[in-house]
């Protein structure tokens, strides 16, 4: 029945029904490039975007075969690829992003140490690669350099290193120096020599590093790594203590001062095989450097100690090859009886002459190594001459072969 009197219709005019409200579609979110190692271009990323995490940045470097990552506040991220600095095309890094990256690889205490000292050396292990960390402060702001350290240690054979390096590694005691400029692959060569001992000899190998770089799993040998700052407070304390820890082989990293050298020589003279590095470009320059750590009044004593303890010096450099890659070349001194006599007398010029004509002892000069690379077609003469410490001598040798 009608709700109105008399059953009539409503006296009010009908109100038209409003159409139902249909919400307008929301605009699609802007597309943000998703970075993966596979999608990242080799030299530059999509302008205006970049990987979100430090791990992604390092993974791209790892998968592309780059050696270093350079990051800094107010700077465009860059890689080092085959010796050359490479731009990424990503935006400059702001302070908040840089701080977030630090928290990915450092503890609060380590960050506080960097903020206090303005410098920091350390290491971090991702699931796919290990990195050596160096932090610095600069005019533009804080910055970091990450050196990628492969988890798999290349063998002496895989690196095509001279056979004499295996012979040196097999010696029971003495001092072996692997030298070269920064980025020349000293750590890789040392790791290969330690790996050979670990694979073939029953030894106790102790490394004292700042920081630990290549990590060796114990095989035939027992390997223990100690990192300055984490496992020992002071490098020299750890090195001195090592003599009481029953090692057969001691890797001490860089010989930076007289105290380190003295302990290394003492260890090598008391039945240990000791490996160390210096930033020198040739075998003879290495001898000059270590003798130069001592004053004139102590020269006779240090020359005698070095002549008795030194097994050999391997000075390494890296050279760009014809296929765009890089290979190592070596200046190798084996401390034969003749070399010992020259070291005792301080006649270092004669040592290089012996190196050039003692290939049967495993010795060679850097120029001989460079000449062979040119003759084998692995590099150009111009690139070899650019690396040579004695380019006129090398040029004459190259002319003599044509």
Regions from the language model: what does each represent?
Residues 4-5, 11-13, 19-402:
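Short, flexible helix-loop junctions that flank or precede catalytic/ligand sites
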């Amino acid at each position: 029945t009608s709700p109105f009197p008399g059953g009539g219709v409503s006296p009010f005019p009908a109100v038209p029904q409003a159409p139902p409200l249909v919400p307008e579609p929301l605009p699609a979110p802007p597309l943000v490039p998703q970075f993966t190692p596979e999608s990242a271009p080799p030299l530059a990323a999509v302008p205006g975007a970049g990987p979100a995490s430090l791990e992604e940045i390092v993974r791209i470097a790892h998968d592309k075969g780059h050696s270093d990552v350079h990051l800094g506040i107010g700077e465009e991220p860059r890689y080092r690829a085959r010796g050359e600095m490479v731009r990424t095309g990503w935006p400059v890094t702001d302070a908040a992003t840089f701080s977030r990256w630090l928290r990915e690889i450092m503890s609060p205490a380590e960050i506080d140490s960097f903020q206090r000292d303005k410098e920091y050396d350390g290491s971090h292990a991702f699931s796919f690669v290990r990195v050596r960390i160096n932090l610095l402060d600069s005019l533009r702001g804080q910055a970091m350099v990450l050196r990628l350290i492969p988890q798999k240690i290349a063998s002496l054979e895989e690196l095509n290193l001279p056979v004499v390096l295996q012979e040196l590694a097999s010696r029971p005691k003495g001092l072996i120096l692997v030298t070269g400029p920064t980025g020349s692959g000293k750590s890789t060569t040392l790791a290969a020599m330690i790996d050979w001992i670990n694979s073939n000899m029953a030894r106790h190998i102790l490394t004292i590093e700042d920081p630990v770089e290549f990590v060796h799993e114990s095989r035939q040998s027992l390997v223990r790594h100690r990192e300055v700052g984490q496992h020992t407070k002071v490098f020299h304390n750890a090195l001195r203590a090592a003599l009481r820890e029953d090692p057969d082989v001691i890797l001490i990293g860089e010989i930076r001062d007289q105290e380190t050298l003295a302990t290394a020589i003492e260890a090598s003279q008391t039945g240990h095989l000791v490996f160390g590095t210096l930033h020198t470009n040739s075998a003879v320059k290495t001898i000059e450097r270590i003798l130069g750590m001592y004053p004139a009044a102590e020269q006779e004593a240090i020359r005698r100690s070095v002549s008795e303890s030194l097994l050999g010096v391997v000075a390494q450099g890296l050279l760009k090859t014809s296929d765009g890659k890089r290979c190592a070349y070596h200046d190798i001194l084996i401390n034969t009886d003749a070399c010992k006599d020259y070291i005792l007398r301080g006649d270092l010029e004669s040592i290089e002459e012996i190196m050039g004509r003692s290939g049967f002892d495993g010795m060679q000069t850097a120029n001989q190594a460079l000449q062979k690379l040119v003759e084998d077609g692995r590099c150009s003469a111009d690139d070899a001459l650019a690396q040579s410490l004695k380019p006129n001598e090398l040029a004459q040798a190259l002319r003599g072969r044509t």
